[in-house]
Structures are given as C-alpha cells and as structure tokens.
Amino acid sequence: LEPNQLNLFPDVKATPPARTEGLVMSEAALLRWKSQIFDYQQRVRETKPVQQVTLFDLAPKHCDPDRIDPLFLRLVPMSFYRMPADSPGDACLYFVVDSAAGLLLYVGETCKSNQRWKGIHGCKDYIASYQDLHYRYGLQTAVNAAFWWDAPTDRRARQELELSLILKWRSPFNKENWQLWGQPFG
C-alpha cells in the first residue's frame, strides 16, 4: 500500500494461494496408455495397405508413406543435435522412438536437420516428462531419434508426408493425436 492509500480491509492478511501438486499418471495408467498405442501401431505395421486401382497411369509419388516404418530406421541417440555440424543439414523426416517399448512417439519434418532440435522444441519437454515418469516407476525406456533422408525438398510435399505419417501411426506426442491419446506429458 502507498502511504496515503486507504486500506479497506486492515485485518485481512494476504496469503499466497496453496499450490497443488500436478497430477501424476499412475504406473498402471502409464502401462495401459503405452499398451494401447503399441497395439494400434502393431496393427498398422501388420496390415497391408489397400492398393488403389486407377484408370490412368499416374506417376508414382516420390514418397510413399506406406513404405516408411520408423522402427526399422537406424536409431541415433537423442543427443544427436548437440554434435558439431558443418552445415545446416538436409531436408528429412525425423522420428522419436522408444525402442525399449517399440513405440513411435513423434513424427516431424525439417529442411535443416542439423538445426531443428538445437533451439526450443516442445517435444524435448514431452520426452523429459516421459522419461521422468518411467524413472519414477523403475520402468525402462530407450528414447532415440531416427531419420528418413529421402524426404521431398519441397516444404509443402514434406509437410503432407509428415501429416500422413502422423495420422497413420497416431504418434502420441504430435498435437494432431492429443485428442485420441491425451496429453499426459505436455
């Protein structure tokens, strides 16, 4: 209060609001969440895509999303972006995978593979929360990245491919799938 300001409530002492602890997913809920995602992604992996018949000979797409299985790409540690780089990098699709659980967690695209993760990336926080929760319950994780280098250099085509893979695999850290899987690590 200012020295000349009237105090309408002299007997009321200001107290900070009590902070409530954030809700923490139980171990059973975490395992159920992962199991549902795993089951869905396994069905995608095992189901042959429907071949659409055309009346005309159409040029095949540069990139067929049905030919990309992120769990079969070469994995690199999540610290890949801390490595020195002599160029901004190339256009690619990148995937965040928990190889211990066989889960695809995130799908992304970039035109600068060596720079995309150097700054702020919301997925870093999801990964940290995911790993922290597993650590709390003594559960193993192996979160890695994988890259698919045959991505289109055209931004729009690359983003269309990214979206088709996000929707196909229903990767839980992508915002497009939060309504489906929830957002327990956001």
PLM regions and their residue ranges:
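Generic N-terminal leader/processing signal
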Residues: 32, 118-121, 172-173, 177
